[in-house]
């Protein structure tokens, strides 16, 4: 499987409403989105690609209460760290957000992921 399909499976186990990039309008709460933010290409001195990829991944959680969204992002951090499909390291604590147009609380955390190419 690809890192993205492994990530989707891992996140769906914590929240069945998990989507790449953005959730469809009207999605029930809570929900999770994930988006790749680039990363550093890995290679060797002879310019051949390494067998691993380095990806910066943003995980965004949304819920109707601050406590619910904090619990969800913390549960996700725990399973990301424990994953055997890839190596994931948080790049800081989650950032809190509040969406005025949807009245949803958000929690956004970035991870550094190393996975097989």
Where are these regions (language model features)?
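Short secondary-structure boundary micro-motifs
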Residues: 43-45, 52-55, 96-97
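Short, surface-exposed, polar/charged, turn-prone segments marking secondary-structure boundaries
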Residues: 46-48, 59-64, 84-89, 116-117
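Oligomerization/assembly interface segments of phage tail-like spikes and tubes
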Residues: 51-64, 69, 105-115
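Sterically constrained small-residue positions within well-ordered secondary structures
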Residues: 25, 48-50, 100-102
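Small/polar-rich, solvent-exposed N-terminal microdomains that initiate assembly or binding
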Residues: 1-47, 67, 71-78, 83
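Generic serine detector
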Residues: 2-5, 60, 64, 83, ...
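Acidic-leaning, charged glycine-interspersed low-complexity segments
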Residues: 78-117
């Amino acid at each position: 499987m690809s890192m993205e399909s492994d990530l989707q499976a891992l996140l769906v186990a914590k929240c069945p409403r998990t989507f790449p990039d953005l959730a469809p309008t009207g999605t029930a709460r809570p929900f999770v989105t994930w988006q790749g933010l680039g990363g550093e290409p890995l290679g060797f001195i002879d310019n051949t690609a390494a067998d691993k990829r380095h990806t910066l991944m943003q995980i965004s959680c949304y819920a109707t209460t601050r406590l619910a969204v904090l619990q969800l992002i913390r549960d996700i951090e725990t399973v990301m760290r424990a994953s055997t499909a890839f190596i994931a390291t948080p790049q800081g604590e989650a950032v809190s957000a509040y969406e005025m147009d949807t009245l949803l609380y958000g929690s956004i955390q970035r991870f550094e992921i190393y996975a097989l190419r």
